[in-house]
């Protein structure tokens, strides 16, 4: 059966654990699995600009023995002169998987309904699930476990990282708190979905408008840019509500002494996170970025073996 990875809860807790175990193995032995030997191809489509996503997927596909066919969404007919369902059906005749970084989750869902190969969400407006796999791999390395950790995300609770951290985090048994200012809460649909999944794993989901309360005793502090791609012209009016949610030394002091700091990058230093914290000993930001490579390779291997 074809499996897609469009949102974090597309993997069950057991399946997520399988992918993370494989990611750890592939980090130790990068060329031990070659399911794309041939080479076989993976379509990698970008409607949004990318650095880490592009480099990590291209290199990962190469290490798996395959060839990445990388295209800019603007240079294709995606959703313009044929339906996305038809595009998914056609691309499935050429490649073994489709990786897509897009502006709209519904576009991924539409293409998946017509595709007969796995489709991977490399980022959408609602979710960033590959990033959260890398985050979880990083936490497992640093903490030696996932279940029972207390993770708080600070900033825009309505963005894709907050949604994916909720869904992916509770799938791993992590207690997730979203600390966000008024008006920037997570989508209630995804809060409900995360709480349903949390009921299976013994995790919890909490929302707070108090950054200090969110940091108190936390094992993991996560943040992301306050201004996502496409919001650059919103100016100071957008930034102002987030200032109390900056991850800085004072906030980190409230967390567990062995707390880990994550940021998916790119970071706006001096805004959502300070230099002192991102470059400090509790930061795992650059390990986290590296683990995009290993986690995504593991995901592709897992999906291809499910076909």
Curated annotation (Swiss-Prot):
One of its GO terms (biological process) is arginine biosynthetic process via ornithine. Pathway: Amino-acid biosynthesis; L-arginine biosynthesis; L-arginine from L-ornithine and carbamoyl phosphate: step 1/3. It is found in: Cytoplasm. The keyword Ribosomal protein does not apply. Pfam families: OTCace, OTCace_N. Transmembrane segments: none annotated. It comes from Mycolicibacterium smegmatis (strain ATCC 700084 / mc(2)155) (Mycobacterium smegmatis). One of its GO terms (molecular function) is ornithine carbamoyltransferase activity. L-ornithine binds at residues 160, 224, 228-229. This is Ornithine carbamoyltransferase. It catalyses: carbamoyl phosphate + L-ornithine = L-citrulline + phosphate + H(+). It is an enzyme of class 2 (transferase). Reversibly catalyzes the transfer of the carbamoyl group from carbamoyl phosphate (CP) to the N(epsilon) atom of ornithine (ORN) to produce L-citrulline, which is a substrate for argininosuccinate synthetase, the enzyme involved in the final step in arginine biosynthesis. The gene is argF. Its main location: cytoplasm. Inhibited by arginine, norvaline. Keywords: Amino-acid biosynthesis, Arginine biosynthesis, Cytoplasm, Transferase.
């Amino acid at each position: 059966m074809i499996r897609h990875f469009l949102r974090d809860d597309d993997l069950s807790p057991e399946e997520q654990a399988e992918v993370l175990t494989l990611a750890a193995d592939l980090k130790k032995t990068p060329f031990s699995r070659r399911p794309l030997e041939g080479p076989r191809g993976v379509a990698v489509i970008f409607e949004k600009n990318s650095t880490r996503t592009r480099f990590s997927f291209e290199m990962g596909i190469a290490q798996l023995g395959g060839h990445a066919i990388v295209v800019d969404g603007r240079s294709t007919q995606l959703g313009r002169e044929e339906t996305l369902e038809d595009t998914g059906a056609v691309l499935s005749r050429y490649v073994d998987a489709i990786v897509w970084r897009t502006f709209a989750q519904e576009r991924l869902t539409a293409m998946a309904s017509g595709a007969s190969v796995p489709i991977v969400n490399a980022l959408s407006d609602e979710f960033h699930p590959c990033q959260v796999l890398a985050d979880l791999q990083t936490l497992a390395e640093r903490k030696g476990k996932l279940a029972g950790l207390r993770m708080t995300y600070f900033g825009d609770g309505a963005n894709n990282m907050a949604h994916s951290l909720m869904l992916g985090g509770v799938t791993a048994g992590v207690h997730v708190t979203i600390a966000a200012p008024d008006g920037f809460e997570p989508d209630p649909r995804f809060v409900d979905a995360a709480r349903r999944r949390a009921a299976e794993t013994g995790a919890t989901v909490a929302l707070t408008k108090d950054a200090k309360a969110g940091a108190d005793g936390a094992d993991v502090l996560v943040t992301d840019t306050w201004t996502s791609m496409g919001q650059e012209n919103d100016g100071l009016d957008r930034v102002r509500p987030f200032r109390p949610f900056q991850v800085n030394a004072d906030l980190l002091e409230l967390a567990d002494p062995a707390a880990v700091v994550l940021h998916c990058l790119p970071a706006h230093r001096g805004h959502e996170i300070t230099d002192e914290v991102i470059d400090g000993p509790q930061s795992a930001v650059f390990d986290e970025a590296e683990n995009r490579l290993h986690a995504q390779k593991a995901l592709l291997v897992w999906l291809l073996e499910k076909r």
